[in-house]
């Protein structure tokens, strides 16, 4: 019990036992020598209450950090995981195309005919396929024409599907801000809110001039059917406007057998509305990956 007064609170204290007191003091001196810096370069920085440690350079750095953490960790946990059945969907489409002597495709939002295009391979592989490709933007439409100019089976049209024939503004990323978005050319929608959301993914507080509007020609469903006949497959990629286009298709008079559209940009309410409308019309609806939905007639035997 005599060692209680040897060392307390980091300093030697007088003790009735001289040996313990001396050894304790020696121990403290040795530890102090170990922790003592050997040179000025190895000096241990001391915390000063008046100094603040800055982890981020500015508010933009804070936003980027929070955004990255949210997207990478929180959102995947909240979303319902959908297995990727893209290969099954591709084989299903090929099987249906092969089983018919003629097959007609309508693609809404064809862009340049190559980028993320599910129709391109079908046209190249099967000679009995004919396609009508709608693309309202001037530059992608020009690329579409160059791609299919020597194929009489393909009809590119510079127009967008809408409720009536005429024109309306299409919102795109402005040319002055296109270098800030890696896929600026593919972000075009009748919904300005969708383009704003797409800009915020790569821009910090995009200004109003980051979004521009382009006047485009529109065509309705009835005009397309009267001119080109019934379509077997309709592929929709309208950047957030897919739900409205699903409701523009006349499912009572000459309905298509297969409809493929993007659900990733739709609200949950719009997803339910599209699925309910298609099921009431006799379609089987399947989300075959995290971005796309396939709706097909029951007799076609859609993969479950």
Task: Give the label of every model feature segment.
Residues 1-6:
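Intrinsically disordered, glycine-rich low-complexity segments
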Residues 11, 15, 26-304:
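Phosphate/nucleotide-binding beta-alpha loop and adjacent structural elements of enzyme active sites
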């Amino acid at each position: 019990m005599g060692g209680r007064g040897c060392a307390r609170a980091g300093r030697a204290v007088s003790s009735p036992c001289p040996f313990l007191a001396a050894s304790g003091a020696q121990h403290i001196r040795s530890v102090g020598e170990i922790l003592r810096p050997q040179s000025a370069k190895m000096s241990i920085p001391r915390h000063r209450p008046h100094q603040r440690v800055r982890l981020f350079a500015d508010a933009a750095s804070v936003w980027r950090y929070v955004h990255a953490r949210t997207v990478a960790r929180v959102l995947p946990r909240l979303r319902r995981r959908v297995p990727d059945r893209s290969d099954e969907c591709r084989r299903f489409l090929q099987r249906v195309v092969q089983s018919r002597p003629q097959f007609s495709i309508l693609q809404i939002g064809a862009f340049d005919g190559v980028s993320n295009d599910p129709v391109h391979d079908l046209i190249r592989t099967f000679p009995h396929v004919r396609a009508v490709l709608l693309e309202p933007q001037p530059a992608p439409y020009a690329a579409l024409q160059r791609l299919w100019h020597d194929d009489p089976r393909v009809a590119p049209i510079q127009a967008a599907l809408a409720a009536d024939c005429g024109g309306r503004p299409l919102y795109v990323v402005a040319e002055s801000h296109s270098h800030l978005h890696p896929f600026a050319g593919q972000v075009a929608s009748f919904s300005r809110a969708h383009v704003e959301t797409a800009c915020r993914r790569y821009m910090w507080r995009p200004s109003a001039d980051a979004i521009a509007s382009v006047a485009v020609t529109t065509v309705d469903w009835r005009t397309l059917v009267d001119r080109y006949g019934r379509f077997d497959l309709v592929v929709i990629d309208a950047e957030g406007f897919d739900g409205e286009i699903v409701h523009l298709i006349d499912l009572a008079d000459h309905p298509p057998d297969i409809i493929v559209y993007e659900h990733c940009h739709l609200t949950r309410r719009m997803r339910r509305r599209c699925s309910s409308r298609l099921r009431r019309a006799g379609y089987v609806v399947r989300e075959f990956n995290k971005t796309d939905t396939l709706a097909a007639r029951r007799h076609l035997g859609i993969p479950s």
